[in-house]
Each structure stands twice: as C-alpha cells, then as structure tokens.
Amino acid sequence: MLIVNRFRWAACQLDALENCLNYKMLQNALASLPKTLDETYARILHGIPEEHKQNAIRILQFLTYSEQPLRIEEAVDAIVVDVEADQHFDPKYRMPNPHDILYYCSSLVVLVSAKDHSYNEDDKIVQLQLAHSSIREYLTSNRLDNNIAQNFQEIAAKASIATVCLAYLLHLDVELPTKEIRQRFPLAQYSARYWITYAAVAESKDETLQGFITEFFCCHRSSYRNCYNLYRPDQPWDDEPAKRGEEPASALYYASFGGLINAVKYLLSQGADVNAQGGFYSNALQAASGAGHDKIVELLLSKGADVNAQGGQYGNALQAALGAGHDKIVELLLSKGARSYIV
C-alpha cells in the first residue's frame, strides 16, 4: 500500500506541474510540493475555486458514498439540482460538454469507459470515478480540515445525496412512459433506486431531508408513481416493474420497508391505513418484519396493524421475520398474538 500511495502522490505532483507555463513557475511549484498524500489531497481541495466548490463537494459526496459508479450523464444532472429553488431541476442548466465536469475536482476524479449493463442501448458508457481508492479513504477519515470534513461525514453526505435524488424525482411530476423518463432524465433510475437507502441513514438527523421525504410521499402522485415504476425496492430483481401493470404500494408500505421511522410516524399521524394491501409483502407490517425494522414493527402494531394479516410473499409478518432470521421481531410478533400457523 505504501508503494501504491507513493505512485499516487507522484501522479498528483505531475498533474500540478502541468500547470507551470515557464521555468520560474516550475521552480516555485517544485519548492512547495506537499510531502505526503494527505497534504496533496488537502491542497487540491483547498485549491478548488469558490465558485466551483459546491458542485465539487456534491460530486465527491456522490462518488465517495455511491452504491455504484456514476455515469457521466448522471453526474451532470446531479450538479444541476438546486434543492433550495422552487424548480429543483432545469435541463437548460446542464453542462454543454459533459466532459468538462472534470474541471470541478481537478486530480481527484477520472472518466472511465465501461461496459453498459443498464438501460442505455449503447455498448459503452462513460463513468465518473474517484481517481484512486485512497481518495475515498481520505475523505472519510478524521484527517480533513473541519470546514471540509463536515461535508463528508456519513450522515451529512448521505442526507445531501438523498435530498438531491428526491428533488430530482419531484421534478418528474408528469405522466411519461418509463422508457422516456430513463432517456430524458439520466439520474432518474439512480435516484429511484438509492434515495431511500441514503435517507434511512440520515432521516432522523436532517430536517431538510425530512421535508423532502414528506413532500415526495404526500404531495406529488406522478413523481411517486414514476419513481416506483422505475424501481421497486421490495422487488430489486424486476428491471421493468411498470410492465406488470401493478400500481405501486402505499407510501406507508415503502417507508416501513425502507426503515424511515420518522416518515412512518408522520404518515400514520395523517391517517394512513396501517393495514392497506399492496406490494411484494402485501402490507406494511410484513414489509417491515421482512426487512428487519423492529422499531417500525412495534410502531405499526401499536397503531392497530393486524399481526396475523394474510398475503404477500411469506403469507404473514411472522413468516417474513422467520424467513429473514430476525429473531427480535419474531419474539415481538409472538408476544402480540401472532400465530405460528393459520388455519
């Protein structure tokens, strides 16, 4: 690892020296080269122009915590999102040349050609990636300056990513075929797939994110339908859920499955039907039981969820918890009258 880091350090210095236009600039640069990889990354981050900093941080947050590599088109749309504006996304603000996205993060990111395994019809795609694994390690360490570190703490970064994804999905409050959404809005599939994963980590800590979750679940039916026609988190193997013609399940169901306890509390306070049918697990209680969210299971039961409700993949909540090995939930359901078999 030490040798690899030295090569990485040398590569960064060569990148810095490329900007020297004459001998004097070269001398000055050589005299002030950082001695370690940490110092090198710190200098690169501090050297990002102020007008580029917001976009650079967002790109680095996505790449540091992303569940999968970002296509360049996804990254371009991610930095267009304005979570504070009335119109969260406007395509006219996309970069004319997507490859220019490299300028935001200097030596920290690279473009890589990769095989496409998604919905793009082309054989090859271009992905934006961190230039080296040591960058992720540095950004998630305790060695950053405080004013930068706060952006890369897990909860803050994942709250930011989830909010961007939800803001993007809220823009899709129109009736469009799923195929057209994927073609016109490159970040839509990623947002639909991952927003709830990021939100589950940060929901209870970030009021802005809570507001976006509430708006998404309660106020924009087309955005909601488009999201779950792109991806159903309870059926991740299904690439085309919309083709089966089944309507998405209730907001309470997906919030329960995703572990969003604050959203579950809010939806119940607004009169959501705790026993509503729909989804792979048939109801919110079975979804939460199968996913292992014991606090949500307890909450749903306290609000009148039928502990022996039938339906779904496992038949009932107890079987879902047993099948997934969630012993604490099994004990909880049994204590609330769940029957081990139903006649």
Predicted regions and their residues:
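Leucine/isoleucine-rich amphipathic helices and adjacent mixed helix/strand linkers
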Residues: 5-276, 287
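Ankyrin-repeat helix-start
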Residues: 251-252, 283-288, 316-321
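Ankyrin repeat domain, specifically the short helix-to-loop turn at the C-terminus of the second helix
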Residues: 265-273, 298-306, 331-339
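Ankyrin repeat boundary signal
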Residues: 274-277, 307-310, 342-343
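Leucine-rich solenoid repeat scaffolds
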Residues: 318-323, 327-343
